[in-house]
Amino acid sequence: MIIKPKIRGFICTTTHPVGCEKNIQAQIEYTKQQGKIANGPKRVLVIGSSAGYGMSSRVAAAYGSDASTIGVFFEKPATEKKPGSAGWYNSAAFEKQAKADGLYAKSINGDAFSHEIKAKVVELIKQDLGQIDAIIYSVAAPVRKLPDTGEVIRSSLKPIGETYISTAIDTNKDVIINATVEPATEEEVADTVTVMGGQDWELWLSALGEAGVLAEGLKTVAYSYIGTELTWPIYWDGALGKAKIDLDRASTAIQAQLAPLNGEAYVSVQKSVVTQASSAIPVMPLYISMVFKIMKEKGLHEGCMEQIYRLFTSQLYKQDGSAPETDQARRIRLDDWELRDDVQQACKELWPKITTENLFELTDYKEYKEEFVQLFGFSIDGVDYDADVDTVVEFDCLSV
């Protein structure tokens, strides 16, 4: 099949297996060049491991610390008529390379929210690794099926209290618009917390703890985002923000649970990056296009892989073994460079100046669009997109 990108809204409906593999190879090469992580983890479970920060965490653990990794994700393999999801190809590429390099890597494809997958992971850990010493929680799902009742709960990308009106980009037409988003109801806010809050992270730690597979000194981290004043109304002050605050609650509860093991639980607040999740949030494509340009000019720009390598080396696994630096809510702040006063002041000054006519000139919107399609394996150097490729990529992946 010859595959070209087809974009509908904030989703690319096609994926390119060769491009996805190149993406993973680039992350692996970056990590190898950085060198080994002192005191790094050796047996790592990544929940939500197929893309974004989760995949970068798996790469950092495996290639920065020679760790055995188990990845959990919910992805679609290809059919004869349709390519698989990008996360499927990413995971296949990682596992292929890891095994070629003599690293233990196994994956389980299924609903991370279910009891069944937790039981399957416990079984696999007991069988192959005995225990684990790190758990990365990086699930970005818009919908959650409650494991006890089967009820399906949906999250909302909405403000709280009043209608949100802001400058934004219509990414289909590449024009500046005024985006209007109606406020969430109380039920929508509660549902968003149920889907995107910390409850499932807690359930994972409980299931693994009860099974006795958590090692002494275990570290677990969940990824979050706070953003800036420009994005707070739709994000931190909106329904999503309430879910992220619930992650903080869960972090404290898990920390207490891990006390007998001298374990640690943290929320790590990351910088804004181009992901399918962030592209769905009104205002984020414009903000990201601006802040990327400013951070690149200042030599501060990082993608997912750079962020996670810095998280591991400067916070979670320091050479001297000391604890991470945290804010008042015990969060690790990897958004520190993005939130620098000079960066944010430049964003505030640039924001009102953006028009359709100067969008490509004043921001990194061209690069934003390119990075977006790269998530799906397109616009990657060294890939022949006119070549016929086999979309069916199989690997030894357990499914639940």
UniProtKB/Swiss-Prot annotation:
GO molecular function per UniProt: enoyl-[acyl-carrier-protein] reductase (NADH) activity; NAD binding; trans-2-enoyl-CoA reductase (NADH) activity
Q: Where does this protein act, in terms of pathway?
A: Lipid metabolism; fatty acid biosynthesis
Does the keyword field hold Lipid biosynthesis? Answer: yes
Binding residues for NAD(+): 74-75, 111-112, 139-140, 244, 273-275
Keyword Oxidoreductase part of the UniProt annotation: yes
Q: Write the Enzyme Commission number(s) for this entry.
A: 1.3.1.9
Return the annotated site residues (Plays an important role in discriminating NADH against NADPH): 75
Q: Which GO terms describe its biological process?
A: fatty acid biosynthetic process
User: What are the record keywords, sorted?
Assistant: Fatty acid biosynthesis, Fatty acid metabolism, Lipid biosynthesis, Lipid metabolism, NAD, Oxidoreductase
Top-level taxon in the UniProt lineage: Bacteria
Record's catalysed reaction(s): a 2,3-saturated acyl-[ACP] + NAD(+) = a (2E)-enoyl-[ACP] + NADH + H(+)
May I ask which residue range the UniProt record assigns to the signal sequence? Answer: none
Positions that bind substrate: 225
Q: What PANTHER family does this protein map onto?
A: ENOYL-[ACYL-CARRIER-PROTEIN] REDUCTASE [NADH]
State what this protein does.
Involved in the final reduction of the elongation cycle of fatty acid synthesis (FAS II). Catalyzes the reduction of a carbon-carbon double bond in an enoyl moiety that is covalently linked to an acyl carrier protein (ACP).
Recorded hits in HAMAP family, A to Z, give: FabV_reductase
The family assignment reads: Belongs to the TER reductase family.
Kindly provide the name given to this protein in its UniProt entry.
Enoyl-[acyl-carrier-protein] reductase [NADH]
Top-down, what is the taxonomic lineage of the species of origin? Bacteria, Pseudomonadati, Pseudomonadota, Gammaproteobacteria, Alteromonadales
- Name the gene that codes for it: fabV
